[in-house]
């Protein structure tokens, strides 16, 4: 009888006790007392256990707060120049997370959050600074575009969607999200249209500033789990923004004129006016920004008060842009050299080529952000051809390639025709 039972069992199609898949649908089926489990379910169990362990470790591990000098040292690896801005950010971020991690009861002193406002022209490194800070601290990070935000109830993105995006960056871990960093770009674009309050509704300007106030200062935001608009039947996640660091950035075009008027730059006399403009560059003027200047620009007083740390980034000159091309860990020339190296080709740039790239970026007023598009345009053809040129060993990018769209010099191990002849004979 026992033998017959075994034979009957062998003839049966066995199935996984967890997912129900048959032994024919999976790679392995492991038998236990009265149960079976397939390789797919084992893999899923391993993933669940690993995720739980990681989450517990994240909760138990106290955030290590780097010293300001350590933060700046890492910023130096990715951001060229902007020394004062990097020092200011390093101190502000260190103090912010020290405030969060402090377990000492401070009944007599309340440490307030210090959000940051970055002023500077396009391509000066505002976004890169914020991204690098988040990487140093290993905290969730998200970027929001202020021009897409509108007041609640109007077409556009609600300000709460910023927190939804941060929550997604934290893999929906609310505790991690509540220690994250939010960078709001183009903040100058939500300035109200005039210095005086208007009776008409400004849903994408002053209205957005008002909506951002509580979020930046610290509030418990009710956010929909999957983003989008709120509706009454929906369940909400509660996220406390008290310990989220908000960094706002913008070019603030025209703010220099406001500062210059306050400082008496437009003094009487034609000659005095010209002299003041020569002496005071945009960078120099932005260094002297005061809250009253931002008020005249169109930011509301309450919003300015939520961003106590204001730092200006410098305009990037030719030397700075050349250094950006060469020095950082993620320098563009290093990236392109690595791409060519994967095809067995050495890529070289002449000094004239680097100067031409930097000057073209200055001419376009694109700053460091414009460097990649200039390089891509100049090198498109050679990047298209090199993978097909098996004998190519070296590519030289000269000034003429950038300015006159000339062909780069390509050196071969042997003439291409000679390399192709043996193939013809063998054929």
Swiss-Prot record:
Keywords: ATP-binding, Chaperone, Metal-binding, Nucleotide-binding, Zinc. GO terms for biological process: cell division; proteolysis involved in protein catabolic process. ATP binds at residues 121-128. Residues 3-57 form the ClpX-type ZB domain. It comes from the Bacteria. One of its GO terms (molecular function) is unfolded protein binding. Disulfide bonds: none annotated. SUPFAM superfamilies: Glucocorticoid receptor-like (DNA-binding domain) (SSF57716), P-loop containing nucleoside triphosphate hydrolases (SSF52540). Pfam families: AAA_2, ClpB_D2-small, zf-C4_ClpX. GO terms for cellular component: HslUV protease complex. Zn(2+) binds at residues 16, 19, 38, 41. Component of the ClpX-ClpP complex. Forms a hexameric ring that, in the presence of ATP, binds to fourteen ClpP subunits assembled into a disk-like structure with a central cavity, resembling the structure of eukaryotic proteasomes. Belongs to the ClpX chaperone family. HAMAP family: ClpX. ATP-dependent specificity component of the Clp protease. It directs the protease to specific substrates. Can perform chaperone functions in the absence of ClpP. This is ATP-dependent Clp protease ATP-binding subunit ClpX. The gene is clpX.
């Amino acid at each position: 009888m026992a033998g017959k039972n075994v034979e009957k069992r062998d003839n049966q199609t066995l199935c996984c006790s967890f997912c129900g898949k048959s032994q024919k649908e999976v790679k392995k089926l492991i038998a236990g007392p009265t149960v079976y489990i397939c390789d797919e379910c084992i893999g899923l169990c391993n993933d669940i256990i690993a995720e739980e362990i990681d989450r517990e470790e994240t909760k138990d591990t106290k955030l290590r707060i780097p010293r300001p000098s350590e933060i700046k040292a890492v910023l130096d690896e990715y951001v060229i120049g902007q020394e004062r801005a990097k020092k200011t950010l390093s101190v502000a971020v260190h103090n912010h997370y020290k405030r969060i991690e402090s377990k000492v009861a401070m009944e007599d002193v309340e440490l307030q959050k210090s959000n940051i406002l970055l002023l500077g022209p396009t391509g000066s490194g505002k976004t890169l600074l914020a991204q690098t800070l988040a990487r140093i601290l290993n905290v969730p990070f998200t970027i929001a575009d202020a021009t897409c935000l509108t007041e609640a109830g109007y077409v556009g993105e609600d300000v709460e969607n910023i927190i939804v995006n941060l929550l997604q960056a934290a893999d929906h871990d609310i505790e991690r999200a509540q220690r994250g960093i939010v960078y709001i770009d183009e903040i100058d674009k939500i300035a109200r249209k005039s210095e005086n309050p208007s009776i008409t509704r400004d849903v994408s300007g002053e209205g957005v500033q008002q909506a951002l106030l509580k979020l930046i200062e610290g509030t418990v935001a009710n956010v929909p789990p999957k983003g989008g608009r709120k509706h009454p039947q929906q369940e909400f996640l509660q996220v406390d923004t008290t310990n989220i660091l908000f960094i706002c950035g913008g070019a603030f075009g025209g703010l220099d004129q406001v500062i210059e008027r306050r400082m008496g730059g437009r003094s009487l006399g034609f000659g005095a006016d010209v002299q003041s403009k020569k002496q005071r560059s945009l960078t120099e003027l932005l260094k002297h920004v005061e809250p009253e200047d931002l008020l005249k620009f169109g930011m509301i007083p309450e919003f300015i008060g939520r961003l106590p740390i204001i730092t200006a980034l410098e305009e990037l000159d030719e030397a700075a842009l050349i250094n950006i091309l060469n020095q950082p860990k993620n320098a563009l020339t290093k990236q392109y050299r690595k791409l060519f190296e994967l095809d067995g080709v050495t890529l070289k740039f002449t000094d004239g080529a680097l100067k031409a790239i930097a000057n073209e970026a200055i001419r376009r007023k694109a700053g460091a952000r414009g460097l990649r598009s200039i390089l891509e345009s100049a090198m498109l053809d050679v990047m298209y051809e090199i993978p097909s040129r098996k004998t190519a060993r070296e590519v030289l990018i000269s000034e003429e390639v950038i300015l006159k769209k000339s062909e780069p010099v390509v050196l071969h191990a042997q003439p291409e025709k000679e390399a192709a002849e043996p193939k013809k004979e063998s054929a």
